Amino acid sequence: MAEFANASHEVINVTLGTTLAATTKLVMPTPAKPILPVQTGVQAQQEEQSSGMTIFFSLLVLAICIILVHLLIKYRLHFLPESVAVVSLGIIMGAFIKIIEAQKLANWKEEEMFRPNMFFLLLLPPIIFESGYSLHKGNFFQNIGSITLFSVFGTAISAFIVGGGIYFLGQADVIYKLNMTDSFAFGSLISAVDPVATIAIFNALNVDPVLNMLVFGESILNDAVSIVLTNTAEGLTRENMSDVSGWQTFLQALGYFLKMFFGSAALGTLTGLISALVLKHIDLRKTPSLEFGMMIIFAYLPYGLAEGISLSGIMAILFSGIVMSHYTHHNLSPVTQILMQQTLRTVAFMCETCVFAFLGLSIFSFPHKFEMSFVIWCIVLVLFGRAVNIFPLSYLLNFFRDHKITPKMMFIMWFSGLRGAIPYALSLHLGLEPIEKRQLIGTTTIIIVLFTVLLLGGGTMPLIRLIGIEDSKARKRNKKDVNLSKTEKMGNTIESEHLSELTEGEYEAQYIKRQDLKGFMWLDAKYLNPFFTRRLTQEDLHHGRIQMKTLTNKWYEEVRQGPSGSEDDEQELL
């Protein structure tokens, strides 16, 4: 019995021990993942070297592009738009790098790759903010109804036509087969227009200001709408929609779009108004460096906040730029006004140049999947979708507009539907599976962008001259006097509406007592503008003029005392 009891006791102990061990094993917490990636010294050094080479390569490309733009201005090659020249240079550089890699002299494959995250976080926000900040708000708000109709409903029409056409052609085995959400995502991203070359030609030939603003205003809002539509399609792709009907899918997509559009616009507007109140009641005009720093913070703030709460940072930063230009800008000192305007233009120019250069480089930088039928049908659908967007909506708007959109203007608006950097970056950002689908979308997008920029952009000026839509004064000019350099125009001018200096009495006499102000313009002049902007006193104006005069004299003294200064140079400056 004793032996049996001992044996039983041992079995119980073993069983309990096994159970406790198993229990302990089950409840043992998993080790926490390291916050920072674990890297060896060699890996960290290699990553630093790769990042350094990427920065060097990007700056090298940018420097070469700046020299190219300078040569265009110096030798008055104004017939060639800068975007076309930079894309062409990128193609040449990409071919040169490909030859070097083939000879095994160097391998810059990692450095020449365009990273979509870098585009959306660093390059796109300054471009969008500057377009809103430098917007001619008078013409924009006078045509806000037409611009909104083209940019929102027109972009949606184009996206549905392109996406639906690709889907049904794929189901008919005419082209590569994509599912509904992938087709709509591609239709949305390829509907973003970027008429940089066209706007430059419009400015050079002095076309109708209404036509100029309709095309320019549509392109500004259209970019944000296209990004929101693409994000909507991506959101539907990530969710399991197999048990949801088509009508429910449409309602869900519509709700997501409305939330993104109006929520982001409201966030950007609110941020801009807060910045106006902050700089109105906190007087930083005597310290321009602090004032400028505060403006830069408020410029990027809505983008980060919107992205952090799952809204559209691009839409938020666009509306923030428009509001800050309309209210906050007038609370700044004259020095910071000029500094802000020129800094934004410089940064936007560098970002645009980087994007167009890497667009040309991308032809050789990643593997492509080319299908002739898919490319041809996509180009046809893009042109057809643009036509269905422009012509019916223009005829509809003419019932309500005093300044009618003529058939010639409609045709130019259709022809100016160039595609640019945003479709290219969005195509690389899509997480499509399998990989060949992503390569097909990327390759097709690059071909469409190059087709529209080089062919449509290059053919806009001959078309305008052919149909005679340019201003009569511009028609008398010699072709050599036509200037398509956006950089030269921006460098030679300061927007007069951004440097207005009005006292309280002058503002009341000029705006509030005007009888022709209606609707929002009257509300803005009567209540909003006085509430959000600082009305200057005569003492403030006097101090601002002294500050500008002091800085100008200081600059002139530094130039005159420079190592290459001479009497002839002084006479030239005078």
UniProtKB/Swiss-Prot annotation:
Known function: Involved in pH regulation to eliminate acids generated by active metabolism or to counter adverse environmental conditions. Major proton extruding system driven by the inward sodium ion chemical gradient. Plays an important role in signal transduction.
Disulfide pairings: none
Protein source organism: Gallus gallus (Chicken)
NCBIfam families: b_cpa1
Mode of membrane association: Multi-pass membrane protein
Keywords: Antiport, Golgi apparatus, Ion transport, Membrane, Sodium, Sodium transport, Transmembrane, Transmembrane helix, Transport
Residue stretches spanning the membrane: 53-73, 77-97, 116-136, 149-169, 184-204, 254-274, 304-324, 347-367, 373-393, 410-430, 444-464
InterPro entries: Cation/H_exchanger_CPA1, Cation/H_exchanger_TM, NaH_exchanger
Gene Ontology cellular-component terms listed: Golgi membrane
Localization (cell): Golgi apparatus membrane
Predominant location: Golgi
Gene3D superfamilies linked to this entry: 6.10.140.1330
GO MF term list: potassium:proton antiporter activity; sodium:proton antiporter activity
Family: Belongs to the monovalent cation:proton antiporter 1 (CPA1) transporter (TC 2.A.36) family.
Annotated PANTHER family: SODIUM/HYDROGEN EXCHANGER, SODIUM_HYDROGEN EXCHANGER 8
GO biological process: potassium ion transmembrane transport; regulation of intracellular pH
Protein name: Sodium/hydrogen exchanger 8
